[in-house]
Amino acid sequence: MCTFSMTIKTFLLCLCLTACNGNEEVYSTTLPEQETEAETSSGYPSLLNKTVPVPAEYLEEAASQGSVVQIDYDTRNYVDGNGEMRSNTAYVYLPYGYEESSDECYDVFYFVHGHGETAASFFQNENGMMRNLLDHLIANGDMSPIIVVSTSYVYGTPVDYYPDADPYCKALPQELVNDLIPLVESRYRTYTQQTDFEGLQASRNHRAIGGFSMGAVTTWYALECTLDYFKYFMPISSDGWSLGRFAGMDYPDETAAHLADIIRSSSSSGNDFYIWACSGTDDVAYDRIWIQVQAMAQITDVFDINHLTFHEQESARHVFGSLSEYFFNALPFMFPDCYDVNSQQFTNDNL
């Protein structure tokens, strides 16, 4: 938590948000209602966009490496709602140079794993693939330095049948807001000045949540239940289950209308949110999320392409290894590196 004013930096980062995003190839599947949109503040010209492959060197160890810290914390049983105390574990990525930059605040991305994995998986799988990617994105100036927190919805022994994890996925956003986010964002230098609910709402523009598979189910629940605490949502390869298991695929119009009503009634977020949804063309869950996203895009007063886009990775399957390309494309959009704090000059040539 930073205790000094970052007003100028925050304003300039917001001002340059759209100018730093041009790193995706796109092809048009613009809906009829959106054909009049020549340009949008999102930087994406259509609902459906193709992702750009990750350079091979980004998956290798970087010269400047961040660190990963384990955090064990106290929480409650939010599934049964009985107030029973329990413990959970998260892993926090701190970017290279964090210890030396005592006057800089950091945005935070919260990641939720898929079935059969743990909070440790995000930074360990594929020989540290995601950790290497973060190191390179930051070192090469593709994005601003951020803190990444890998979380878990698992209570004790994981369930065998992945849909049975649904109640745990639904409970995790509440656990994050009540217990983990206040701990992380008071311990580390973030934009959160106070860790009560009002303070977390005030800093929501500097916070994102995303997840893969059942983690995507969790991300849709976060949109439904904790919209006032996150600005960016990154569901990867699964639909939302607010109206029942697989409801986003089976009842896309009803799911879209439900989420739109939630957003319209939000007390603090207004239209200040963004859903960066994605999947792979060979992913078994591709249709689940894409069907829902198309239904959402029909509700143009809420889910126009300034607030919702879908990003498709060619030939990608439902495996952890596909995540690097999604994050390579998404993180520079959410957290652009447009402003050099030391020189107090914009660094993007397009500005």
Regions found by a protein language model. Give the residues of each.
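Bacterial signal peptide processing site
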Residues: N21-E24
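Sec-dependent signal peptide recognition
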Residues: T3-L13
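Accessible peptide chain termini
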Residues: M1-T3, L351
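C-terminal motif of bacterial Sec signal peptides marking the signal peptidase cleavage site
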Residues: C16-A19
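Non-catalytic cap/lid and distal C-terminal segments of serine-dependent acyl enzymes
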Residues: Y27-L351
